[in-house]
């Protein structure tokens, strides 16, 4: 896996602090799976 591909994937999964504060850990599962 190239570094650029990893970064673009990471950016797609990125969750803002505000979103996490509002939704809690469940938003991680929605975004990642």
Swiss-Prot record:
- What GO CC terms are in its UniProt record? cytoplasm; cytoskeleton
Q: Where in or outside the cell?
A: Cytoplasm, Cytoskeleton
The identity of this protein, by name, is Actin
Record keyword ATP-binding present:
yes
Q: What does this protein do?
A: Actins are highly conserved proteins that are involved in various types of cell motility and are ubiquitously expressed in all eukaryotic cells.
Sorted alphabetically, which Gene3D superfamilies does this protein's record hold?
3.30.420.40
Task: State the superkingdom.
Answer: Eukaryota
Kindly state which reaction or reactions the protein catalyses: ATP + H2O = ADP + phosphate + H(+)
E.C. number(s) listed in UniProt: 3.6.4.-
* Sorted UniProt keywords: ATP-binding, Cytoplasm, Cytoskeleton, Hydrolase, Nucleotide-binding
Where does it mainly reside?
Answer: cytoplasm
What are the leading ranks of the lineage? Answer: Eukaryota, Metazoa, Ecdysozoa, Nematoda, Chromadorea
GO function term, MF aspect, one: hydrolase activity
Q: Which family does it belong to?
A: Belongs to the actin family.
């Amino acid at each position: 896996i190239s570094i650029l591909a990893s970064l673009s994937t990471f950016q797609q999964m990125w969750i803002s602090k505000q979103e996490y504060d509002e939704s809690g850990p469940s938003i991680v599962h929605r975004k990642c799976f």
